UniProtKB/Swiss-Prot annotation:
Site, as annotated: Reversibly protonated during proton transport: 61
Transmembrane segments: 7-27, 57-77
Sequence similarity: Belongs to the ATPase C chain family.
Keyword Transferase found: no
Protein name: ATP synthase subunit c
GO terms for cellular component: plasma membrane-derived thylakoid membrane; proton-transporting ATP synthase complex; proton-transporting two-sector ATPase complex, proton-transporting domain
Membrane topology: Multi-pass membrane protein
Organism: Synechococcus sp. (strain RCC307)
Amino acid sequence: MDSITSAASVVAAGLAVGLAAIGPGIGQGTASGGAVEGIARQPEAEGKIRGTLLLSLAFMESLTIYGLVVALVLLFANPFAG
């Protein structure tokens, strides 16, 4: 693998993880804030809100994991290596 392809793969892997973490990070903060506000308004609905929050946080975190998988493929099983 030539040095340009190798360097571009490392940069792309870093961008994949970094950019894949921005959206879910913002979404998780917003969802958690909304859940805290909802529990503060209706404490009796805490169990239902918490369950829904945890499920949605898991779905959001899966987007970051997909970015990590793309980065690992670029680093260790590079399809552009030729």
